Every structure is written in C-alpha cells, then in structure tokens.
Amino acid sequence: MPSSAAATLFALFLMLLPAEKVTILAGDLKEPFAIDWDKAGNAYIAEMGGNRISLLDKAGKQSVLAGTGEKGLSGDGGAAAKAQFNGPHHLLVGPDGDLYVADTFNNCVRKIDLKSGVVTRVAGTGKKAYSGDGGPAVSADFGGIYCIAFDPKGEKLVMCDLDSRRIRAMSLKTGIVETVAGNGQKGMPKNGEDAKTQPLVDPRAVAVDSKGTIYILERAGHALRAVDAAGKIHTVAGTGKGGLSGDGGPALQAQMNGPKHLSCDKEDNVLIADTETHTIRRYSPKDGKITRVAGTGKKGSGGVGGAPDQVELDRPHGATIDPSGAIVISDSENHRVLRIEK
C-alpha cells in the first residue's frame, strides 16, 4: 500500500477514536461520594457506605486512611485509623494541608492531620439540631453537614447544613460560625434578595468559585442557586421540576433530578452530579447554558473505555477536577471512581 494511502487510513482511524475516554481510577470501594488531592498528588476518597476514608497514593496503591468501617462517633484526639465515622459524604484538603471531612450523619466536620494521622472535630457537637451562630463552630449544632467548601482566600470553611436549610461558614482563624444563606424555612428564594433572609428547599451541596460566588445545589429543589459577593441570591439553573432536559440551552429552562454534588473548575464553570439522571452536567456562568459532560441518562455500568457520553453511571454523587484538569466522577452505586482522559 502506498505510504500516502496508509497515512490517510491511519488519520481516519484516529478520527474514529473518541477524543476523550473514560477510565477507572479506583474500584473496590463502598459507595464513594467524594475525592480530593493533596499537593503531592495523593487522592483521598470518602466512602459513604464504608464509613471510612481511603487513600489512593500517587503510585496507585489503595489503602484505608481513616475509619474502622463501623458507624459511630469516636476517636477524636487519636489516630484517625481507629476512629469511627458515620456516612461521610464529602471531603477536601484544606489550605493548611489537612484533610477536612463532612461526617454527615454525625452532624460535624472533622479534620485529619495528614502528617500525624490524628483526627479532631472542628465543627458540630454531634447533636442534630440548629444552634450556635456567632459562637465557636465546635460548640454549634448542625442538621447534617453534607458538603463543604473553602473560600478563595482560604479564610473560611463553608458548610452545607441541609436539615437546618442553611449554608454556614466558619472562620478558620477564629473558629466562629455564622449563617451566610437560608433562614431555616423551606421554600424557593426570591431572586435578588439577601440570601440570609430567604428560604431554601434542601441545600445538598455547596461550592465557591474564584470570585467568591457561593453556589448552592438543591436536591429536591432540582436547582442551582448563586450567592454573589453582595450576598444576593439568584437561581441560575433548573426549573425546579425534576427531569432531564435542556442540554445545550439556557440553564434556567433545563431540568435536573435530585442533584447531589457540585464543584467549580479553573474557568469557574460549575460541574453538577445530577444523581438521579445518572449524568454529569456543566453550568457556564458566562453564557448561562448547561451541557452534558458524561452519562447516557441510563442507569448502568457499561461504556468504560469509551467516550464520556456513552458511559453508564449509577447515581453519581461527586464530580470534580483533578490536579491535571481532568474530570473525576464518584460513580457511587457502581462503587468506583472514574476519570475522563483526553
């Protein structure tokens, strides 16, 4: 075969290959809900169903970092490996290099010193209630902390207090907690109003972009809200009715169904784990549109090795960006973590 013909065939072959493909980053997990990385490239995974935190080191070795696997609240002040957790939904490596864990059903946030391995409680008494604004977060009560975020300056820990229907923030310097969104009542907030005076449906997840905009994802509200630097709240995505529609168009005309997690990329786009539609979607604040990133919309486990729009997911509870800029998905009910490679 002439070299020119061979080159043409090879070029056609490359065109048929997916520009992106989905690979398995980690498996053998019990309902992974969240993942984050330290500066060295080690990954930490919150296993909601396993009541533990797993470590995936940069060499690819997987081990248990924290949690005995039994539900409970114990071990503060001691080794994280001997501590008990209860349904941890989220985690993040903080600006101080320590690992912060939303210990959801223990109604608190705990911190693991990654150098010493010691775990301590930084927010929440463990009691499910609402109290403590204006005082130390460690003495305050929360109604299930489902998600956490840090502000761009690394000064505040922002917490999603779902059953209290509030977003609360703790100063990392003073430890004092305050409400930044939600008045405790159930309902849809009015656009342009002070976020602290408005109701929320059920704030399930929170993220903060590089400008300090606080994004709130509502599970049963099927919507994404944004709190700007002035403290005003607006709905930016979702009709409020559950469904799967609107990809490629205005986000306010799109439907989501029980979304559970969100994160912001370097361009301040918002990734959304649209859990009950088994998809990952992206909201762009620049043009107000929403697009599908991964998932067919069908519950399943097929399609690994292929294009993101052909992979089947099963109730994903996490969507985030790894240090290289790749999208990583917590494919929870398939008990695995996926990575979209270019």
Question: Language-model segments: what does each one mean?
Answer:
Residues 7-15:
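Bacterial N-terminal signal peptides
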Residues 42-44, 98-100, 156-158, 213-215, ...:
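Conserved beta-propeller blade signature
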Residues 48, 104, 162, 172, ...:
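Short loop/turn segments immediately following the C-termini of beta-strands
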Residues 315-342:
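Blade-level signature of beta-propeller repeat domains, shared across WD40, Kelch, NHL, RCC1
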Residues 51-54, 107-111, 118, 165-169, ...:
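A short loop-to-beta-strand structural motif that recurs across blades of beta-propeller domains
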Residues 37-40, 93-96, 150-154, 208-211, ...:
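Residue-level detector of Asp-centered blade-edge/turn motifs that repeat once per structural unit
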Residues 20-31, 44, 61-87, 117-144, ...:
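Gly/Pro-rich loop segments of beta-rich domains
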